[in-house]
Amino acid sequence: SDLAITPEPCVATIGFFDGVHAGHRYLIQQVKEIAAAKGLRSALVTFPVHPRKVMNVEYHPELLTTPEEKISLLADIGVDYCLMLDFTPEISRLTAREFMTQLLKERYQVKYLVIGYDHRFGHNRSEGFEDYVRYGKEIGIEVIRAKAYTSNIEIGNEPNIPVSSSLIRKLLHEGEVSLAAHCLKYEYFLDGIVVGGYQVGRKIGFPTANLRVDDPDKLIPADGVYAVWVTFDGKTYMGMLNIGVRPTIDNGPNRTIEVNILHFHSDIYDKFIRLTFVKRTRDRKSVV
């Protein structure tokens, strides 16, 4: 539930949780297990807007999940409370001790705080785990270090790469949607509205739909051609997706997201659709 306060003491963790990836899920599972052992509710404290964007409106974080997508994924995991904290300039100035006292202790009734292995919070993120433990003892919060999560994937010659939102962004920028899905524990997706476009594919017998992504901060994977699932009106179809500029049209800078829905020939302009990435098939396709 999305609440301003928790009505009862809880075991909590805190973070932005962009992507709600495998590492996040491992951390949240530890929160749930500790809560069950202590007979308390589980909770996580997160932010609807990236903290850096609050401080700099020009910052574009390249989100793996929009706020709405993140809430939906977190709800599926099954924590008792998902606490959305509006990050403000005032909150950004709180020290870690002030944050723990004013928000975690007094507002959210946190009894146990589970900290991700590399997570920092507080003004300038200048303090670390040992500081949080000391503050917790002073104000009545037991601070627990979560076990680290490592993947079983190998990138280059490095095995067991730690899963992070930054790693997944890097993979998507390289078009590695299958590896990204392994780290996310679900296939990456884009939501948006079908809009008019060049429609060159339609002219040569391949009807295409151009997607306008809902959130301009959502990360778009690397240019290329992808096998995707296309979902709308409660049905799912196979599709081939082309992401890239239109070099065969006018060499313009506009980047397009254009999908050919296989064995489907109806107009779906203005429809809300979801594109779910399965695999990348090649770098880029020219349609004329």
Summary of predicted features, one role per range:
Residues S1-D2, L83:
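Short acidic-hydrophobic, aromatic-tinged amphipathic segments that line or gate anion-handling sites
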Residues E62-K70, L94-M100:
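Glycine-rich, highly charged phosphate/nucleotide-binding loops
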Residues G197-V288:
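Phosphate/ribose-recognition catalytic cores of enzymes acting on nucleotide-derived substrates
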Residues E69-L83:
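A glycine-rich helix N-cap at a beta->alpha junction
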Residues R93-P207, R282-K285:
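Classical nucleotidyltransferase
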